[in-house]
Amino acid sequence: MGLRTVLASQVLPALEAVDRSGNRLDNRLLPSCFSYGAPASNERLPEDLLCALWDEAASLSGEPDFGLRAGEQFMSARSFGITGMLAWHSKTAGAALTNASRYAALVIDGSHLNFEHDGQVVSILGSDDPRPKYWSRHYGEAKKQAFLSLLRRSTGLPLVPHLVEFRHAPGMDVPCTSKFSAAG
């Protein structure tokens, strides 16, 4: 199977958060698409490089919860490309999840979000892509936090996370699962 790529815009929140902390990522670490500011909206990076850039940004910031903060403050619908814009303009959380699931592969090659709901609880399950995804901690946390924030802002619902699990390293048998519900 080929190398998995992601939208280059997925690294911009990490760069903004590092800049805001008074540090700068070494330009030699950045791919050429960042030479003149933000990359084109369709520019792609190898997933491993994206995770390495997020890890380096977190290291420079010195924050243990860098990914959560960057996901909340700096990721937007635009960070997720057309997928985020479709989710943002959905009228319901269900429509937003359906759109995000349908177009997830535009953000990360091979991605397809599976989700289930049971009354007020929605479970977002990992992709059915056979290639395992072990994101860096900070990138994984930023994506989950940003997606939750995007759903909250686009629907106006007070969504509350119940359970979030990540696979951080090979050999760990933990499913990528998120559960949240609308409080109230």
What do the PLM-derived regions correspond to, one by one?
Residues 90-184:
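Alpha-helical bundle regulatory/interaction domains
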